Structure formats: C-alpha cells, structure tokens
Amino acid sequence: MWCPDTPLVTYMIDMIVFSCRRFIPVILFVFTAVCFYTSPATASLNKYMAKHRGIEVSREQHKRLADYDKLIKHFCSFSFFEPRHKVNPDFIRALILAESNCKSTALSCKNARGLTQIIYTTGKQAARELVQKDFDYKYVSKEQLQNLQPEDLYKPEVNILLACYLVAKYNYQNHGKLDLVVSAWNAGEYSITDNKPAQYKETLNHIGKVNGYFLYLLKNKQSFN
C-alpha cells in the first residue's frame, strides 16, 4: 500500500517463498511499501528498517556463505508445507548473516547455536516434525533428527535444514510476511499479536537487519549463480 502524503517509504518483502509454476518457473516476490504512520509500533519498526536499509555483504562474507551454498540450495528445494512453495535461498543467507555472520560454532548467551542460532528446544521440536515428513533429506538422516542433541546444531547441514523448515513453517503461519516470520524466529512463534511483530528492540532490529541483507542479496544475485 502506498502512502502518497508520506515522503519516507521503506520497502519490505512480504513473500519469502517462491512458487514453482508449470509454465513460469520464476521466483515470485510481493514488494509492499511500509508507510511511516504515527502508530508507535509501526514507527518503531520503520526506524530499524531505515537503519539497515543500506547494509551490504562484504567480499569475505560472500566467501563464507559460498561454503554453505550447496546445503542452502538443497534444503530450500523442499516444499515443506505447500506444493511448489519453497523457501528463498537468499532469505536463508540473510538469516545466516544476521544471526552468526556465517560462524557455524556461534553460541549466544541464550544458548542459541550454529549458523542460524537455533535454540535446542525449538530445534528438537522441528526435528520431530521433519521425521514425520516423507522426505529423504540426503545430508541429514532421520535417525539423526530423531536423536538430535544440542551439539548437532553446530553442524551446518543440520542447522540449515532446521532453519529452512522453521522459516517455511513461520512463513506458512504468517502468510509470507517477513516481519512476522523474523519475529517468530527471534522472539518465538507465539510472540505475534494483532498481526504485528513482537515490540522488543532486539526483535525489531533483527527484522530490519534480515530485511536489509535480503534486499542486498536479491539485488546482487550474480554472486550466487
């Protein structure tokens, strides 16, 4: 939605999955303009969106991401919740950059682990759900998922698989709205009220950061072709 009376507009991407159609196998994105309303919640989010609007990915970060490119592309090829709807690889790359700066051994003060900083209880539940699905994940066995241990979250193949699944889940639950997906990721899937992200500074900053990286990667796709 456009707000013609508002001079400042931040662009957000509402769709973080793409639909593989039979005749038009293109990535489908819906770009919407987030207007600077007077609502405190919206104004607060806009501040962090603007803060990270010009973020870039360095040469070194590109090189680190390339180490995980095979795994990202593979696990983003699964349609976990809807046929032909798959997680955009660039969103996973953006999440990795924002969460750990591509460090597979990263550990937060809240015991979030690995490339995408997954909490063990969240990862364990996601692993149980993945076991029930009729997929061969190739790089991660169902036995490994069934017996997931905290240290497994440091393994890139496990961490990226869980991240792709959780992003697909939150995307499905929140109708592809990036701010709500990242809010669910950062503050928990029950952090969303009235179709708005959690109003924590950390969460709002994280939404802006992931969105900034995502936009940069979309504009510079040749780096991963």
Regions found by a protein language model. Name each.
Residues M1, M12-M15:
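Methionine residue identity
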Residues I16-I27:
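Bacterial N-terminal signal peptides that target proteins for export
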